[in-house]
Amino acid sequence: MAILTRMLGSPLFVEIRRGAVDRLAELLTERHISSDGTVLVALGRGQGEAIWATLEESLPRAGVFVVQSASLDCASELLKRLDERDYDAVVGIGGGRTLDVAKYAATRAALPMIAVATNLAHDGICSPVSSLTHPGGSGSFGVAMPLAVMVDLDYVHRAPPRMVRSGIGDAISNLSAIEDWYLAHRHRGEAVDGLAVTFARTAAEAMLHRQDDIASDDFLIALAEALILSGMAMSVAGTSRPCSGACHEIIHSINALHPTVSNHGELAGLGALFAFFLREDQPRFDLVLRCLLRHGLPVHPADVGLDEEQFLEAVLHAPATRPDRYTILEHLDLGREDMRARVTQFGQLTRPDGLRLVQEATR
């Protein structure tokens, strides 16, 4: 008999609005997650701690753990804390790093996890992946998606604008990842999940053409929804493929070679722009370029603190970060001098005088 349906993992509850976090204790009770608030709250430093100060009275039975770093060691410490009491769930309050630690520990403890996001820097708020550092470098670990996602716009507005804008770069990089997935399908026979593509593309397109910005509640709602949809795309696919291609190989390479130069979302947008340049997809290159410029995101290696030679080395090293993945980088398989020529041309196009010529040509 043919299989006519399939089960899709998704959050049980999503709330994106001002004042959303005030309903956390109520959510735990209403959704039968924890009738008396016996949860372990993993807090990010800064905003996470500030939010907890407003919630502590409503959750007197909760335990508290401050996340010091997005590391496997820190996640293991949180896991040990979970063994000390019979907790009903893990609540992560903070940015992507805090949520990654909370997701990992909750998954290993077989407990539900509630994500309370204080910024929108990348799609980690709802993804089935935790990115954690370890003594050998960094790794991506498969985890359960959050049972519930809360995004309080009051706190997102207080987050550093640069961090919030970077989520735009992560969302639009889906477009490049999708192209890489189809490329792998054509040349390697890799299966493509159409529903995952639909979620990932919808997330990216929602950001690509908007003319408002992060000062607007409507824009932040759209960005939060885009990042949640990206997480859904990965859950549906059972892999990060719909949201991770050459763009993310470049991110991992830059992080390995120059770990302090920029953040995930900014590098995702830059990596996607370079990938569209390599594909010689001028219409899509122009759209992505305009979106990044509109939101003040990096479009040139120098914008993230890299010179041409450093960016070249990162691009050449990028395929080694995901040996199992086939993207435009593996497809072209350019040698050093050929790639140097492409990097130089890309730099000329995206430096200020080059941008003026591009913008004049596309009016």
Where do the language-model regions lie?
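A glycine/threonine-rich phosphate-anchoring loop and its flanking beta-alpha core
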Residues: 12, 26, 108-203
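Solvent-exposed alpha-helices and their adjacent loops that cap or buttress functional pockets
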Residues: 6-7, 33-34, 82-85, 106, ...
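Non-transmembrane, aqueous-exposed alpha-helical and coiled segments at domain scale
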Residues: 74-86, 246-247, 282, 349, ...
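A short, small-residue-rich loop immediately preceding and capping a beta-strand
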Residues: 82-105, 109-120
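Short glycine/serine/threonine-rich phosphate/pyrophosphate-binding segments
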Residues: 24, 48-51, 97-103, 122-125, ...
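Active-site segments that bind and position negatively charged phosphate/pyrophosphate groups
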Residues: 194-302, 306
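ATP/NTP phosphate-donor binding region
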Residues: 1-89
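C-terminal charged capping/lid subdomain of soluble metabolic enzymes
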Residues: 1-3, 7-8, 169-171, 281-363
